Every structure is written in C-alpha cells, then in structure tokens.
C-alpha cells in the first residue's frame, strides 16, 4: 500500500514557514523560496556569531588606543605595560572605562606608567 506524505509534509512545511515569518514577499509565503532563504539566513547567523566576536574586539582596541593617544602613549605599549605590571583587566573592561569613566582609565594608566 502506498503511503502519502500528507501529515508529515504539512508539518514540515508549517515548521519552515513559521521560521520564515518576517521575510519579504514570496520568501515568507512559498515553501521552496522560504526554505532556500532560511538555509541562507541560518548560514549568515552561524557565520556572524563568529564575526561578532572579532568585530567587538577590534572596536575595543580602537577605543583603548584613542584613550591612550590622549595620554601620549600607544595601545601596544599600554597593553605591554599592563602585562608587566600584572594587571589583568580585559579589553572589554578597559574600553568601557575609556568611554564612560575616563578618570578610572587615567588612574590605571598612571599605575602602569613606570612600566612604559
């Protein structure tokens, strides 16, 4: 006896179309287009979760460097001085201090001044 895919197909299509909500035009309404777009969007999401980490680190480096240059030193010298002084502040915290609490960043810079 031949078995048709009625219920299984409907469930599979509903699952894909539910995930495709918010897509534009036929990419939301037509199963094949929605499935293709969904595969692409999942690929982009996976790739960009990795890229986000790189982009944030480079943003933190730029912010720390800008704050260091205001005090006549460079990012690389400052980071080396932090390592030598055994101060374990990460780039995220340092960038936040440079943006929101310049006084604290200046005090950190003064504490590593002898290691520069």
Curated annotation (Swiss-Prot):
PROSITE patterns, per the entry: RIBOSOMAL_L20 (PS00937)
GO annotations of cellular component type: cytosolic large ribosomal subunit
The keyword Oxidoreductase appears for this protein: no
GO molecular-function term, one example from the UniProt record: rRNA binding
Origin: domain of life: Bacteria
Keyword terms: Ribonucleoprotein, Ribosomal protein, RNA-binding, rRNA-binding
Keyword rRNA-binding belongs to the record: yes
Any Gene Ontology biological process: ribosomal large subunit assembly
Function field: Binds directly to 23S ribosomal RNA and is necessary for the in vitro assembly process of the 50S ribosomal subunit. It is not involved in the protein synthesizing functions of that subunit.
Record family assignment: Belongs to the bacterial ribosomal protein bL20 family.
Protein name, as recorded: Large ribosomal subunit protein bL20
Source organism: Helicobacter pylori (strain ATCC 700392 / 26695)
């Amino acid at each position: 006896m031949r078995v048709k895919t009625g219920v299984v197909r409907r469930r599979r299509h509903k699952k894909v179309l539910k995930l495709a909500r918010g897509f534009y035009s036929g990419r939301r309404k037509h199963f094949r287009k929605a499935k293709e777009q969904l595969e692409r969007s999942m690929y982009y999401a996976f790739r960009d979760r990795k890229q986000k980490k790189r982009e944030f680190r480079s943003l933190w480096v730029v912010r720390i460097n800008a704050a260091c240059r205001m005090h006549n030193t460079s990012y690389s010298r400052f980071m080396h001085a932090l390592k030598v002084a055994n101060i374990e502040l990460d780039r995220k915290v340092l960038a936040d201090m440079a943006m929101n609490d310049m006084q604290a960043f200046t005090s950190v810079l003064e504490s590593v001044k002898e290691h520069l």
